[in-house]
A protein has these predicted regions:
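Feature marking well-ordered beta-strand scaffolds used for ligand recognition
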Residues: 1-140
Length: 140
């Protein structure tokens, strides 16, 4: 869970209806805005401090987090098959190859207008912007 100035917290829920148990908290630069959970860890959008990949082990004290897109304001993150789309507000979206999540590779910034959120839908990227819904094909 993104917890603004406190960074990112990870909880476990043992069964349906059970109370969540705090696994740990990772402090981030900037405000934790939104998180996307993957099998390897958590990608976190941290407003004007870019984005992070935080391996699951980091929440229990092992491993280290990877900060990237430090010079961008990241509001939302979508992940699919080793590609990550960062929603950047007025700058559009940025795409990164995160096949190796601890070493993201920038693929470009695409000015699509003011972008609020993006979501992968199959092999397409749906982008919600002031201009309306845009549907993009991502080629690797």
């Amino acid at each position: 869970m993104a917890v603004d100035q406190l960074g990112v917290e990870l909880y476990s829920i043992d069964s349906l209806g059970a109370d969540p148990n705090l696994v740990g908290r990772v402090d981030t630069e900037g405000n934790g805005e939104q998180v996307t959970l993957t099998s390897d860890g958590v990608f976190a959008a941290c407003d004007d401090a870019g984005a992070y990949f935080i391996p699951t082990g980091k929440f229990s004290g092992t491993g280290s987090s990877t900060r990237f897109a430090e010079d961008l304001t990241v509001d939302h993150i979508a992940v699919n098959n080793g590609i990550i789309a960062l929603s950047l507000g007025a700058k559009g979206i940025a795409l990164y190859d995160v096949t190796e999540p601890t070493a993201p590779v920038e693929k470009g910034i695409f000015p699509l207008g003011y972008t609020y959120k993006s979501q992968f839908w199959g092999e397409k990227l749906l982008v919600c912007s002031r201009e309306g819904l845009q549907i993009l094909a991502i080629e690797q």
